[in-house]
Amino acid sequence: MSSTPSSPLHLAVALDGTGWHPGSWREPVARPRDLFAARYWADLVAEAERGLLDFVTFEDGLGLQSSHFLEPDGRTDQVRGRLDAVLLAARIAPLTRHIGLVPTTVVTHTEPFHISKAIATLDYVSTGRAGLRAQITARPNEAAHFGRRTIPRIDAYESLAAQEVVAGLFDEAADYVEVVRRLWDSWEDDAEIRDAATGRFIDRDKLHYIDFEGRHFSVKGPSITPRPPQGQPVVSALAHWTVPYRLVARQADIGYVTPRDADHARAIVAEIRAEQEAAGRADQPLHVFGDLVVFLDDDPAAATARRERLDALAGSPYTSDARIFTGTPAQLADLLEEWRSAGLSGFRLRPAVLGHDLPAITRGLVPELQRRGAFRRAYEADTLRGLLGLARPANRYAAA
């Protein structure tokens, strides 16, 4: 799905702890004592919904957060510990009406049958606003939590051995998402009859074995949960290079990418579109969102000073896999429009300090984009697929 100046711009925020900067929990607006309370997360999502954002993502993992991508660290001066993202989204769903809820689900070591059921349940309790963000893990210590296999230690993603390991995990992730999608379709939409007079609750002919046999999974099905309200909840994944671009092209509705500038964004979009065509999905809608970490203030100097203060608290300059934007909402709007012209259809923003930068997005950036005619002034659909302009897909097992 390509972006044009007349197509709607989509916005999401990524929720993680007190914010994406490791020093964020020490800011006066942070609420570190509330991190494991449902109300804290409900307040964040309510703020995002007031800003008419398309959806929020909830970060998750199978190990404690770490300053090192590939192994635990011993730090005690940063936020550690999480709530389960899927359960958290389900708790918040009844408190919201329009915004999409997209928990991160680690597809390495977990089972697609369980995740398909969990996300289908979230789609029901949110009345059609669920999605998932599929994520792999290459950390050996996280494999040890399950004891089913080992993953060799990787010292750097750049090595050939590391790339082979990671490529295998992404190949497994593609099979995983395929199983999840087939399980969502294993009940036809009208499989439930619920006729008390005749005593027929379901039509057994409309439940289907999926009989998936792949390199990584063998799953018979059907699911135990009826087909979700959206048919297929929205699937997304973060991608930084060709192998995860291929996962996005094969299986996702949204890919989150991390360009350095507009030219890089244009090249990434072109590569994903080529992979999409190679996968036989050129006719399928696929959003490509840019990921950015944001420090937003009304004065650029204030944003820079705040970032420097947080760096001092953390003990080192903040770095990220995504571009770090420091400036005003108007300057960010300029950047988003520039990158949009490169083919991105939306953006997932990572607030550096949730208590500060999330309201700066909803009360500063959103009104600026609205003034430019680039963002909605009201929610126009009741489902996440509807907000994203994605049609409800037909069931692959239903009789033609």
Give the location of each predicted region:
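Internal, glycine-rich beta/alpha segment that forms the wall or movable "lid"
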Residues: S7, E111-R246, R250-Q251, Q284, ...
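Acidic (Asp/Glu)-rich catalytic clusters
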Residues: P5-S6, A46-R50, A90-R97, D123-T127, ...
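Membrane-embedded alpha-helical bundles of multi-pass transporters/translocases
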Residues: L101-V102, V125, G131, S218, ...
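Active-site mouth loops of central-metabolism enzymes
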Residues: G23-R39, T104-F113, I136, R149-A167, ...
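Conserved, mostly hydrophobic/aromatic
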Residues: L11, A48, L52, I92, ...
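Hydrophobic faces of well-ordered beta-strands that scaffold small-molecule active sites
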Residues: L9-L15, V56-F58, I99-T105, G128-A134, ...
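C-terminal helical cap(s) of enzyme catalytic domains, especially alpha/beta-barrels
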Residues: F146-I154, Y176-R181, A265-E275, L354-F375
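N-terminal beta1-alpha1-beta2 module of alpha/beta enzyme domains
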Residues: S2-T96, Q230-P233, D382, A398-A400
